[in-house]
Design a protein with these regions (language model features):
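N-terminal leader/targeting segments
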Residues: 3-5, 24, 33
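Bacterial N-terminal signal peptides that target proteins for export
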Residues: 3-17
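Sec/Tat signal peptide C-region and signal peptidase I cleavage site
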Residues: 14, 26-32
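Classical Sec-dependent N-terminal signal peptides that target proteins to the secretory pathway
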Residues: 20, 24-26
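Flexible loop/hinge segments at secondary-structure junctions
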Residues: 31-331
Length: 331
């Protein structure tokens, strides 16, 4: 999570002290998250038209669609095409020039960055657009309250790099009793094209290998649907895909440590161990402006209206200080 720390760490802690408008229900669920009032409304400019192609993250797919819808209300002559098949599809699309926008739910890897530099001679630019708590979901009827990351590793990984040797196969091994004790764990996850797959592998599985029994799904919504329909299901996805059929459980970084709910306050403070920054990568040549349509679309995303869409879609908005830093990258 080094990218996240370098992008938002100190600013987020300051934002809490400054009193970001955060409300959490007594059950710890996400509730009443509001956009930082210091984020400015979007200011429409003249002369914006043309086409934008976005290829990348499935996690960001709905957000991109909502942002595009709002942006087209400002600029009806703009066409935005969005394809969300996974974060790994973004870097090659930017290199090939088939997309101007590369949404990713994880930071770009060095070899992906190097491929862009090799072709264009300058580095690709990542713009933070929203925050996310990568949630571990269970069925709404499941009584489990919390897990540690070592336990999550022992559930999903066959290599057990998190430190627990025991191979968890039933809910009873995780402390559930009665009718739940003998129910087998039913694992749902993303496929390898997904940035969420890679992020979870690195941070929850300590870079270990997934079990062969994980039912890989093509999208975040499919993971949540699987857990909804399978009473003994457990899966991972961005918090924005939460539905009434599942619950996101509290997580702790270590065995015996206090568990934190995946809410805004805990993401900002760093208490929730699977928080991340959602990004849009662009090929911005040094000392040259992006095309007006690409620049204005990103400015819209980083405006009051754009961050309100983040909240509407169930994700977490950026503090104003972070927005200012991201906007500066567009200059």
């Amino acid at each position: 999570m080094m990218m996240q720390k370098s992008l938002i760490g100190k600013s987020l802690k300051k934002a809490i002290v400054a009193g970001c408008l955060v409300a959490v229900t007594t059950t710890g669920a996400l509730a009443a998250v509001e956009v930082d009032p210091k984020i400015a409304p979007y200011k429409k400019v003249s002369g914006v038209s043309g086409n934008l192609d976005s290829i990348g993250s499935d996690t960001l797919n709905n957000l991109m669609a909502y942002w595009a819808e709002g942006f087209r209300k400002e600029y009806p002559n703009v066409r935005i095409q969005i394809e969300g098949k996974g974060s790994t599809t973004a870097p090659p699309a930017l290199v090939a020039g088939t997309a101007q926008l590369g949404p990713m739910s994880r930071p770009m890897k060095k070899d992906e960055e190097d491929a862009f530099v090799s072709k264009y001679g300058y580095k690709v630019t990542g713009i933070g657009v929203a925050l996310d708590s990568l949630a571990v979901f269970v069925n709404k009827d499941n009584p489990i309250k919390s897990l540690s990351l070592p336990q999550v590793d022992a559930i999903f990984s066959k290599t057990h790099k998190g430190g627990i040797a025991e191979d968890y196969k039933t809910w009873g091994q995780l402390g559930l009793t009665g009718e739940w004790a003998n129910l087998p764990l039913s694992l749902f996850g993303r496929n390898s094209a997904s940035g969420t797959y890679g992020f979870f592998k690195e941070h929850a599985l300590a870079k270990g290998d997934y079990k062969d029994t994980v039912k890989e799904q093509p999208g975040s919504a499919s993971v949540v649907m699987g857990v909804t329909e399978d009473r003994s299901g457990i899966g991972y996805s961005g918090i924005g895909y939460k539905t009434s059929g599942v619950k996101a459980i509290a997580l702790s970084a270590k065995e015996g440590a206090p568990a934190a709910e995946p809410n805004y306050e805990n993401v900002l403070s760093g208490k929730y161990p699977l928080s991340r920054t959602l990004l849009i990568y662009v090929g911005k040549e040094p000392n040259k402006a992006l095309s007006p349509v690409a620049a204005e679309f990103l400015k819209y995303i980083l405006s009051k209206e754009g961050q309100e869409i983040v909240v509407k879609d169930g994700f977490l908005p950026l503090p104003a200080e972070v927005v200012e830093k991201e906007l500066a990258k567009l200059n």
